[in-house]
């Protein structure tokens, strides 16, 4: 369980956790694979979300998934780029979260194994990404400002020691 005082400080930064959908490169599931290849090459991301026509996250795609299709024969072929759709290649088994309903602790646990998590609303519509990087930035904020917000007293400190410490700090 995350300490309530730490959770409070993290929640102060939680608005900056979410990178909004308007700033995220994505492809649609019915796009030609060629389109995904171009997007991934241009934006230099390793993985991007795949959305359906209703802007729900239905998958993830990487450049490696596309190049695997190009290498299925004995030589490199660009034919699959024109013949296949993104939905034919995308990863369908992935984690996504509803930012409002997912606890900070659950977010942190999911980010251990995922560099980012697609964030959806209650209807499954893509809202943006929660990234490990943004979470680490929030944690950095907590580590560097905790003492500005809270007086931390070791549990093994006696009452006279505590009183002396408080008096000395004034």
Q: Could you tell me what each predicted segment is?
A:
Residues 1-170:
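Tandem CBS (Cystathionine beta-synthase) repeat/Bateman regulatory domains
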